[in-house]
A protein has these predicted regions:
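Conserved RecA-like P-loop NTPase ATPase core
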Residues: 15, 42, 51, 58, ...
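Walker A/P-loop
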Residues: 1, 30-68, 82-86, 110-115
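Short glycine-rich substrate-engagement loop in P-loop NTPases that contacts/grips substrate
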Residues: 21-26, 63-95, 102-103
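A short hydrophobic beta-strand->loop->alpha-helix junction that borders the nucleotide-binding pocket
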Residues: 44, 66-74, 124-125, 145
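Conserved AAA+ ATPase "SRH/arginine-finger" region at the nucleotide-binding site
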Residues: 69, 141-154, 173
């Protein structure tokens, strides 16, 4: 199992950075606490918590969670998940690298998002205004994630060293 998966946070309180989105009283934290989240797109650099936040949302809301990578998925995969989601109220579809989907692939999501069959969470490192088609973008809220600062990175590394079973066996000093 890759280190990123072994140390992935499981709650908003474990997540480092992104206080503007998930800190106490923030808009996204309130939505999660109220159990009502909109379809959304997380935009930010690699390693800022886009996938982690999506997983935390699904775990917090205890709803079915489907995950696709736009690098390898196609319209058929999207349609299969939408069909499954019709029998699973509140289902979340997380699409990593959503900017890699072409217009047709993005259009396949429209009806299901509009009807509330799925709640879409997309993740992208590219500006969604240019990479996500306007019809889909208009049905989503865009949240911008910021790079972690040096203090947060050190805290993350120290936490990994302290908690990870493999790293615990090494003599690592920061």
């Amino acid at each position: 199992i890759p280190l990123a998966e072994r140390i992935r946070p499981t709650s908003l309180d474990e997540l480092l950075g992104q206080e503007h989105l998930v800190g106490n009283g923030s808009i996204l934290r309130k939505a999660i606490e109220n159990g009502k989240i909109p379809s959304m797109i997380f935009w930010g650099p690699p390693g800022t918590g886009k996938t982690s936040i999506a997983n935390i949302i699904a775990n917090s809301l205890k709803v079915p969670f489907f995950q696709l990578s736009a690098i390898s998925a196609g319209v058929k995969d999207v349609r299969e998940i939408i069909e499954l989601a019709k029998t699973k109220p509140g289902a979340i579809l997380f699409i990593d690298e959503i900017h890699r989907f072409n217009k047709g692939q993005q259009d396949a999501l429209l009806g299901a998002v509009e009807k509330g069959i799925i709640t879409l969470i997309g993740a992208t490192t590219e500006n969604p205004s240019f990479e996500v088609n306007s019809a889909l973008l208009s049905r989503c809220q865009v949240y911008v994630l910021k790079s972690l600062n040096e203090e947060q990175l050190i805290k993350l590394l120290q936490s990994a060293i302290d908690k990870d079973e493999i790293l615990k066996t090494k003599k690592i000093k920061l």
